Amino acid sequence: WSAGKQFTQRIAYSTDGGETLHKIDKSVLPTVCKENRDPKVFWHEKSGAYIMTLWLEENDFGIFRSTDLLKWEQTDRLTFKEAWECPDLVCLKDEKGNETWMFWSADGFYFWGEFDGYQFQTDGVRHAAYINKIAYAAQTYSNTGNRVISVPWLRFPNRGRNYTGAM
């Protein structure tokens, strides 16, 4: 269904608490790379902007920012060896309110660093959250206070069923 088509990033919004969604008919972000996909958008209070992480190609990811969700500017391009797809950028706070940021990729690799609303600075040391390849493409919820809630897709065959894996 997507063969030969460019990947685009689009927006749907709700004015009634999510009961109905209204789609914006055009792409809000020009195609950066042929198959760029898997956007994750969150509000970054300190810089007063929405932030989007996006898989670009191979081991490359982009960070974009917008104040209105319609016009986006790329502010960073990151390359992490052996990491790909489904990026997430998460702020973790300790008991004293000190922040550290974690950049996450689909395969459970993550990188510690600092984020200023424009760029993610890291030492590049890759950490692995999983000991096997069952969990994949975890994403976190926004607006959960100081809690970080992450839900992965658990990839395993369900023979005789019309689905694969579980969330």
Question: Where is each model-derived feature located?
Answer:
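Carbohydrate-active catalytic/glycan-binding domains of CAZyme proteins
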Residues: 1-167
